Amino acid sequence: MSSIDKRIKEIVAEQLGVDEAQVTNEASFMDDLGADSLDTVELVMALEEEFDIEISDEDAEKIQSVQDAIDYITDHT
């Protein structure tokens, strides 16, 4: 697991209040981790801050799972 993967999983667990063991690459923020739309907005903001990037609203809507977040951050940093 890369340091980016690990940090994203830590942020997801912290933002959504779930155990890090639940944060698998395949986990959907809403379906598997119990996030609502506000949680996902806050999660995107935390990722933007951590990785010093800006995620457009259009792209943010496409980030639905942990793997989506990893792929996006990896491609944009």
Curated annotation (Swiss-Prot):
Record's subcellular location: Cytoplasm
UniProt superkingdom: Bacteria
Source organism phylogeny: Bacteria, Pseudomonadati, Thermodesulfobacteriota, Desulfuromonadia, Geobacterales
Entry-annotated residues carrying O-(pantetheine 4'-phosphoryl)serine: 37
Function: Carrier of the growing fatty acid chain in fatty acid biosynthesis.
Keywords: Cytoplasm, Fatty acid biosynthesis, Fatty acid metabolism, Lipid biosynthesis, Lipid metabolism, Phosphopantetheine, Phosphoprotein
GO cellular component, one term: membrane
Pathway of action: Lipid metabolism; fatty acid biosynthesis
One GO process term, biological-process aspect: lipid A biosynthetic process
SUPFAM superfamilies: ACP-like
Name of the protein this chain belongs to: Acyl carrier protein
Signal peptide extent: none
InterPro entries hit by this protein: ACP, ACP-like_sf, PP-bd_ACP, Ppantetheine_attach_site
Main location: cytoplasm
Molecular function per GO: acyl binding; acyl carrier activity
Gene3D superfamilies registered for this protein in UniProt: ACP-like
Ranges of residues in domain Carrier: 2-77
